[in-house]
């Protein structure tokens, strides 16, 4: 298969000039064309979408003139004489402009057949030249002529023609050349434009099915909605291909452009036979095989699927042979997870089942092929989600009319592109690949594997794919495999052995991970470390039957010790360090451990056990290097103890639930075979529960037995609300188990794209909570008492929004080998299905009993007399359903008699059903037991409304007589509503509710009359806020009292958590503080870091003071960038506070750029200058004359812009003398702003209104110093400086920009500071679009005077980071960026150069600074830290930093120190990062230098490569060699999800930093 490819060529930028007068009709592009237009607009010089057709015929065979045939084709088909344009003032959408068929002339060029390689390269260049779609027709012709034959090429952009059209054109052309006219019936629209096509359709067809493609109503039709549901499902929970091939481990490819390998020629008979084996088309079998083959070469991520892009015809009936672009490339999900079936300890996928599912997907897709990728992108964007990038595609090109024709496929943007090309009797398969990702050897291996797979699929259609190399690691397996139907085999298995086998099978998979700590531990590392710890434990006397108590800080170390204890043959228990001493004492007393393992916080437990013989071990003293990393000999028996979990007892003493090894093994195996979770290799599981609870056992045992990754949070007790969402995003968590109370805090506004499954359990799950989440993720309602080993039943919830939702009371059927029974209360008779009684559980997950409590064990773990088997009595009341599942009614101990038998759980569930706003509820009988009281949260619940709704659902005696609304209900240690505590403290709770006006009378809650601004005259912080802000202190105290449910005295130094606060109440506190103090950004993490009223007042004081200053500035008409609040420590040092990530809503898209630079007249030329490592420095004539001081040196070099004097006044409505009087900075900036707006296709109307902001960083006006004006009268000339409008004001006048307007100067950081102000204004909604720009042009245009050891270079060269660096070099520059909120840009289909995720500015101040002009690493680090926190992206993700890099030896060294200081604060100290600077190419463009760096990053992201620095011999010796930086000395390829950053520093210490992503 042939393929036209090569390096990217230069070409004209996309243009959207005025329409030609020859245009006779315009009509909107199809959605498929719009998506191609968007790709073209972002890279107009690319030829990725060139589709080429080659004809070969003898000179003697050309009966007609080829040019006449081409002319006839051009007249006949409107698309061959059309141009393509972006939306403008008259057209709301991108559109096609059809030109007059009588005057339209096709591009047709004739060249002689080349005789050498140079000539062939020239022809190839002509074939690959990019086309300006708005100025030229999308198709062109090239004839390569020799004496004997003619090679005629038709090269068309894919936006105009698809493969079917090429086939039709080939037939028509041969007819025309042979003198035979095309049959009119074949081409009914041959001379029609689009309006006539529509008329034809309407006249010929009356069915709505045919008309809807031409009606806007399709987007509001049921068909469209059904299509949207289907296509959203195709990309739901799909993940990008993370290729196992490692490009960084091999030499850079010799070619940067895609290449093709021809793999196979298949006969059509063979393909037909292939398809018939699966009762579908061979193409669908091939799509399934491509999906399987590519998955085998990606990193495992079980539970997620990938997509393969498939082109659908998209041609309505009647247009089958029309010429144009109808192909619609859409993602088809390869349902690998759905196809897997769990048997014999492993998930299996049969190929025929996979084909069946793929074929079904494609069949449904064809019904919805009118829905476009643009529709899908917008639908995903509206949900806060991105559409996955197309990485793998499959296409089938139709047969051409003659064997003399050859079709060259488009190159496409894919990593792998499988192209099937139909011939007369055969089909050829060629594969286009990206050599940056795949080597030639990689593709050859893929070819061999494809061939082997196809051969096997021909002989055994139902073969299991787990045997395929690479696929097995994607399927969950319990190793070694065993018969999961055999109870004894499972009982004999061990969790730690399953983990160990995973480590042997997948040593490099990540077992433990923390994104916040930048920590990853592989299975091999965890296994070897736990083996060494196990050997150490055995040496110190720990053996079979021993019990070890772990008293460790929550984190990965706990997991290491749990595995080590189990491997040593012992059992473990965990005492949570946050527990009060009395509970820890009770746990030690019941557990009777032989060893307590502790960390640096072990003093508390050592005091408790000092009188006992229990040994202690401080993990800080353990030396394990001498111990073997080999596995330990297995010594445990099936009935040996594995762990003890402590639950609350009715007497207040904890109950120790004993779980044996066989119980744990059955939980893991039974949950696996019952499809409770979709955990497998690569699945990210959140470690949310404290290790003292059995929910943690669920997390680590399921995860580490099956190859998943257990993910830890830095502050696990704060895992609620936005912090929980942040941790999910940072760690790409896909599975988590949590209580409904915690799930209720998780914001549904966050996209959480990685999250696939939520397991909810531990308490009653409100139906409304399930409804919120089930359409987004797989929700399972999990059930299992601690005494029955975590979970033994689950009820999956349907994902489809229109599917009926089972009642939340239904907990599902028992897992394999487990069984539900329902007994009468006397425990003497088993009840049939439908009768209510006590739910009992039997099976091998039922635990041993309660430690040292034989009486309680005998009562709760009892042999049922009718069954003769040991059951666990749950205390839950419920009934069996016909399908074996259980319907829970409530707790036996919560059944009361109030004018009849009442299940309190039933009333509580009804309350959450009728009022979804209720997040927690406890119903209790009143003190006389004659009525019910309902305690609910939050405190704004209207009790009267709630009771009215209940009367419609419940009998009168079950409706609470009074509703008490509280900020939060008391919770027990498991995070569940503490009904016992509420029952015991009802009087105080009623007083609290009625005092705050939150009883059922629905009186509004008491709120503060208003916040008081804290202003401290002596300090920038409020460290003395006791005296400075009594109102704030009072308000915070009142909020504490409301949340903690106390009216007692609280001092400003009391710890919130010591008074009873927990993670849920901390989330509530942060929310209420933000509500009370609207200017604050307090997060739940701030509550943990500042847990006292005093600390929180300090945080609030800074933000409220900021609000005060901002309001004063606003009243003067001047905005400023809001400074973050400061946290002041005991030494008076300050550090930036946590700035919550804004998420996608705060991200800003760069949609247009322009500029003029030294040696480059536009951004593309600038990128080429960087790529070629050239200098843009100009050699200037003349000298400075008399030098101003001894030792002075005149250097006749400058980074000058060419033709700064050229300007067309008439184009701007200016007179010549008025223009001459203007500072050239103004003139050039006006032009640059206009070009940027044109580049963004966002030029405003001169007549209309808009809200476009303009923010300019400008250097000092030197034009007035260098010239005298003749413009204006004497008064004007006298006050010229005062009467000259600012650059932003004049530009706004001429371009009619009506939004906020600022001109500023902070020296070299001016442009970046202007960018920061623009971003702030966009985020605040003060403008809809913004232009951020900068300009620095000095006059006169001459060299500079310097001296040795001064800031300017005596050598006339700027060499950042180099040992030759001797200073910077002055330069000029002007640039402008057009900015829009990311959601707006995506919605409107803007081209997006880059996305600003975070940005910050800051000043050095006086601390840690040698002088006003000296740089401050601390000041720069503060600003960098703020920017990354604003972005909400881990700094470890930064692959490159474009630094200020001034070329001064000390300045460069200090800047790198500051950058590393910020990285250390943000947990990225050890990640290597590439750094660079553009000043070696250009010099220092002063006010424009920061934005020049941003434009460099934008173009680098567009071209996929960051160029190296201009020159580097050896690194500057002042730079610390231990810093983990690489100076960019070669091209740095960028991935599609690359994150980079830019720093800019102004003389005097004004710093700016921004974070950019692709």
Swiss-Prot record:
Residues 522-919 are annotated as: Adenylation (A) domain. Residues 27-392 are annotated as: Condensation (C) domain. Its EC number is 6.3.2.50. The keyword Phosphoprotein applies. Residues 1145-1558 form the Ketosynthase family 3 (KS3) domain. It catalyses: acetoacetyl-CoA + L-isoleucine + ATP = tenuazonic acid + AMP + diphosphate + CoA + 2 H(+). Pfam families: AMP-binding, Condensation, ketoacyl-synt, Ketoacyl-synt_C, PP-binding. Residues 995-1028, 1116-1144 are annotated as: Disordered. One of its GO terms (cellular component) is cytoplasm. Its cofactor is pantetheine 4'-phosphate. PROSITE patterns: AMP_BINDING, CARRIER, KS3_1, KS3_2, PHOSPHOPANTETHEINE. Residues 1131-1140 have a biased composition (Polar residues). Residues 1027-1104 form the Carrier domain. One of its GO terms (biological process) is fatty acid biosynthetic process. In the N-terminal section; belongs to the NRP synthetase family. TAS1 has the following domain architecture: C-A-T-T-KS-TE. The N-terminal NRPS module contains the condensation (C), adenylation (A), and thiolation (T) domains and catalyzes the formation of the amide linkage between the isoleucine (Ile) with acetoacetyl-CoA. The ketosynthase (KS) domain and this domain in the PKS portion of TAS1 is indispensable for TAS1 activity by conducting the final cyclization step for tenuazonic acid release. Hybrid PKS-NRPS synthetase that mediates the biosynthesis of the toxin tenuazonic acid (TeA), an inhibitor of protein biosynthesis on ribosomes by suppressing the release of new protein. TAS1 alone is sufficient for TeA synthesis via the condensation of isoleucine (Ile) with acetoacetyl-CoA by the N-terminal NRPS module and subsequent cyclization conducted by the C-terminal KS domain. This is Hybrid PKS-NRPS synthetase TAS1. It comes from Gloeophyllum trabeum (strain ATCC 11539 / FP-39264 / Madison 617) (Brown rot fungus).
């Amino acid at each position: 298969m042939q393929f036209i490819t090569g390096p990217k060529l230069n070409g004209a930028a996309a243009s959207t000039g005025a329409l030609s007068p020859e245009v006779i009709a315009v009509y909107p592009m199809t959605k498929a064309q719009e998506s191609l237009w968007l790709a073209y607009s972002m890279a107009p010089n690319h030829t990725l979408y060139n589709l080429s057709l080659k004809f070969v015929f003898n000179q003697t065979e050309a009966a007609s003139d080829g040019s006449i045939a081409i002319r006839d084709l051009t007249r006949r088909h409107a698309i061959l004489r059309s141009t393509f344009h972006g939306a403008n003032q008259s057209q709301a959408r991108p559109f096609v402009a059809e030109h007059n068929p009588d005057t339209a002339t096709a591009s047709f060029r004739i060249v002689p057949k080349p005789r050498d390689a140079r000539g062939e390269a020239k022809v190839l260049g002509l074939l690959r030249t990019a086309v300006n779609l708005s100025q030229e027709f999308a198709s062109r012709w090239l004839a390569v002529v020799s004496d004997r034959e003619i090679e005629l090429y038709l090269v068309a952009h894919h936006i105009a023609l698809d493969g079917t059209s090429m086939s039709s054109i080939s037939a028509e052309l041969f007819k025309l050349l042979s003198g035979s006219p095309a049959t009119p019936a074949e081409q009914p629209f041959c001379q029609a434009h689009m309006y006539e096509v529509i008329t034809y359709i309407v006249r010929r067809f009356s069915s709505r099915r045919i008309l809807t493609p031409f009606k806007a109503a399709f987007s509001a039709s049921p068909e469209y909605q059904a299509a949207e549901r289907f296509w959203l499902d195709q990309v739901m929970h799909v993940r990008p291909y993370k290729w196992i091939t490692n490009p960084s481990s091999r030499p850079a490819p010799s070619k940067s452009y895609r290449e093709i390998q021809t793999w196979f020629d298949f006969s059509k008979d063979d393909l037909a036979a292939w398809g018939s084996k699966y009762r579908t088309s061979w193409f669908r079998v091939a799509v399934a095989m491509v999906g399987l083959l590519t998955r085998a070469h990606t990193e495992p991520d079980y539970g997620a699927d990938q997509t393969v892009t498939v082109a659908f015809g998209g041609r309505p009936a009647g247009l089958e042979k029309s010429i144009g672009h109808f192909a619609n490339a859409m993602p088809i999900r390869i349902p690998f997870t759905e196809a897997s079936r769990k048997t014999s300890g492993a998930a299996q996928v049969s190929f025929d089942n996979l084909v069946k599912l793929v074929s079904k997907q494609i069949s449904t897709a064809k019904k919805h092929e009118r829905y476009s990728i643009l529709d899908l992108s917008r639908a995903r964007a509206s949900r806060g989600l991105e559409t996955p990038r197309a990485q793998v595609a499959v296409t089938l090109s139709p047969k051409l009319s003659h064997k003399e024709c050859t079709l060259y496929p488009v190159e496409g943007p894919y990593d792998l592109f499988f192209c099937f090309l139909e011939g007369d009797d055969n089909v050829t398969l060629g594969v286009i690949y990206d050599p940056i990702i795949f080597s030639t050897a990689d593709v050859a291996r893929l070819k061999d594997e494809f061939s082997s797979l196809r051969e096997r699929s021909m002989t055994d259609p139902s073969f299991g794919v787990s045997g395929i190399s690479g696929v097995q690691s994607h399927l969950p397996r319990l190793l070694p495999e065993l018969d999961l139907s055999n109870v004894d085999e499972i009982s004999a298995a061990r969790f730690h052995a399953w983990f160990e086998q995973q480590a042997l099978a997948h040593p490099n998979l990540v077992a433990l991970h923390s994104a916040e700590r930048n920590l990853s531990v592989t299975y091999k590392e965890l296994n070897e470390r736990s083996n060494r710890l196990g050997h150490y434990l055995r040496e110190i006397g720990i053996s079979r039957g021993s019990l070890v108590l772990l008293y460790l800080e929550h984190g990965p170390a706990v997991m290491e010790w749990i595995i080590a204890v189990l491997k040593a043959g012992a059992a473990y228990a965990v005492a949570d360090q946050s527990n009060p001493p009395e509970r820890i004492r009770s746990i030690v007393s019941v557990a009777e451990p032989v060893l307590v393992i502790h960390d640096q916080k072990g003093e508390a437990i050592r005091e408790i056990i000092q009188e006992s013989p229990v040994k202690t071990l401080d993990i800080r003293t353990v030396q394990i290097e001498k111990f073997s990393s080999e596995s330990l000999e297995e010594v445990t028996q099936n009935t040996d103890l594995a762990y003890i979990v402590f639950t609350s007892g009715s007497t207040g003493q904890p109950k120790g639930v004993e779980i044996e090894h066989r119980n744990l093994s059955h939980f893991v195996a039974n949950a696996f075979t019952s499809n409770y979770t979709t955990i497998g290799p690569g699945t990210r599981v959140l470690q949310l529960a404290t290790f003292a609870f059995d929910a943690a056992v669920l997390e680590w045992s399921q995860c580490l037995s099956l190859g998943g990754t257990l993910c830890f949070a830095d502050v696990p007790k704060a895992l609620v609300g936005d912090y929980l969402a942040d941790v999910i995003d940072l760690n790409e968590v896909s599975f988590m188990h949590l209580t409904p109370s915690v799930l209720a805090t998780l914001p549904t506004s966050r996209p959480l794209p990685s999250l696939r499954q939520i397991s909810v359990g531990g308490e009653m799950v409100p139906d409304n909570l399930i409804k919120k989440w089930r359409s987004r993720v797989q929700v399972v309602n999990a059930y299992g008492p601690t005494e029955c080993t975590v979970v033994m039943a689950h009820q999956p919830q349907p994902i489809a929004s229109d599917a009926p939702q089972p009642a939340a009371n239904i907990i599902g059927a028992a897992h394999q080998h487990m069984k539900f029974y329902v007994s009468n209360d006397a425990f003497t008779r088993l009840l049939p299905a439908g009768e209510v009684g006590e739910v009992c559980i039997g099976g091998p997950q039922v635990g041993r009993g309660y430690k040292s409590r034989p009486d309680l064990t005998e009562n709760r773990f009892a042999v049922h007399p009718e069954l003769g088997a040991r059951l666990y009595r749950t205390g839950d009341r419920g009934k069996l359903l016909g399908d074996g599942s259980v319907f829970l009614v409530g707790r036996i101990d919560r059944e009361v008699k109030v004018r009849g038998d009442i299940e309190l759980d039933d009333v509580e569930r009804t309350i959450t059903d009728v009022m979804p706003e209720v997040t927690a509820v406890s119903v209790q009988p009143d003190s006389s037991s004659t009525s019910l009281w309902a305690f609910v949260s939050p405190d704004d619940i209207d009790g009267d409304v709630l009771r009215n709704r209940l009367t419609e659902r419940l009998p009168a005696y079950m409706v609470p007589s009074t509703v008490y609304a509280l900020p939060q209900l008391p919770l027990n240690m498991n995070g569940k509503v503490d009904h016992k505590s509420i029952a015991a403290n009802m009087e105080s709770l009623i007083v609290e509710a009625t005092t705050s006006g939150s009883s059922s009378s629905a009186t509004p809650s008491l709120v503060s009359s208003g916040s008081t601004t804290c202003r401290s005259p002596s300090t920038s912080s409020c460290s003395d806020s006791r005296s400075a802000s009594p109102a704030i202190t009072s308000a915070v105290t009142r909020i504490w009292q409301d949340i903690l449910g106390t009216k007692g005295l609280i001092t400003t130094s009391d710890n919130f958590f010591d008074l009873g606060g927990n993670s849920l109440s901390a989330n509530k506190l942060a929310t209420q503080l933000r509500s009370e103090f609207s200017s604050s950004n307090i997060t739940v993490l701030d509550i943990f870091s500042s847990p006292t009223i005093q600390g929180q007042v300090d945080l609030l004081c800074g933000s409220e003071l900021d609000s005060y200053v901002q309001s004063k500035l606003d009243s003067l008409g001047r905005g400023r960038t809001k400074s973050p609040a400061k946290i002041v420590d005991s030494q008076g040092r300050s550090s930036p506070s946590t700035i919550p990530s804004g998420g996608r809503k705060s991200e800003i898209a760069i949609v247009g750029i322009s500029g003029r630079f030294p040696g480059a007249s536009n951004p593309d030329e600038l990128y080429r200058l960087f790529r070629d490592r050239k200098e843009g420095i100009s050699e200037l004539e003349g000298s400075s004359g008399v030098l101003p001081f001894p030792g002075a040196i005149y250097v006749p070099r400058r980074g000058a812009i060419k033709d700064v004097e050229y300007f067309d006044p008439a184009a701007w409505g200016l007179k010549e003398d008025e223009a001459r009087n203007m500072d050239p900075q103004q003139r050039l900036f006006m032009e640059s702003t206009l070009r940027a707006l044109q580049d963004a296709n966002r030029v405003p109307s001169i007549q209309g209104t808009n809200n476009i902001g303009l923010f300019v960083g400008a250097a000092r006006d030197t034009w007035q110093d260098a010239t005298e004006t003749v413009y204006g009268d004497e008064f004007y000339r006298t006050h010229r400086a005062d009467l000259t409008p600012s650059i932003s004001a004049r530009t706004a006048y001429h371009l009619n920009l009506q939004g906020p307007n600022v001109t500023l100067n902070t020296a070299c950081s001016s442009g970046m500071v202007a960018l920061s102000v623009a971003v702030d204004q966009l985020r605040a909604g003060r403008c809809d679009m913004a232009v951020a720009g900068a300009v620095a042009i000095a006059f006169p245009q001459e060299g500079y005077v310097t001296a040795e050891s001064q800031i300017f270079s005596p050598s006339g060269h700027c060499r950042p980071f180099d040992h030759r660096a001797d200073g910077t070099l002055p330069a000029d520059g002007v640039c402008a960026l057009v900015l829009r909120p990311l959601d707006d840009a995506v919605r409107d289909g803007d081209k997006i150069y880059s996305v600003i995720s975070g940005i910050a500015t800051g000043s050095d101040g006086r601390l840690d600074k040698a002088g006003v002009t000296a740089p401050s690493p601390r000041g720069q680090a503060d600003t960098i830290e703020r920017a990354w926190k604003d972005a909400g992206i881990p700094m470890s993700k930064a692959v490159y930093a474009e630094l200020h890099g001034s070329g001064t030896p000390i300045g460069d060294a200090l800047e790198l120190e500051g950058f590393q200081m910020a990285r250390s604060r943000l947990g990225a100290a050890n990640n290597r990062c590439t750094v660079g600077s553009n000043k070696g190419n250009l010099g220092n463009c002063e006010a424009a230098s920061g934005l020049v760096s941003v434009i460099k990053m934008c173009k680098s992201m567009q071209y996929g490569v960051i160029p190296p620095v201009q020159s580097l011999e050896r690194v500057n010796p002042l730079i610390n060699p231990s810093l983990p930086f690489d100076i960019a000395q070669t091209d740095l390829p960028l991935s599609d999800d690359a994150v980079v950053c830019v720093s800019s520093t102004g003389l005097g210490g004004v710093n700016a930093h921004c974070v950019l992503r692709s």
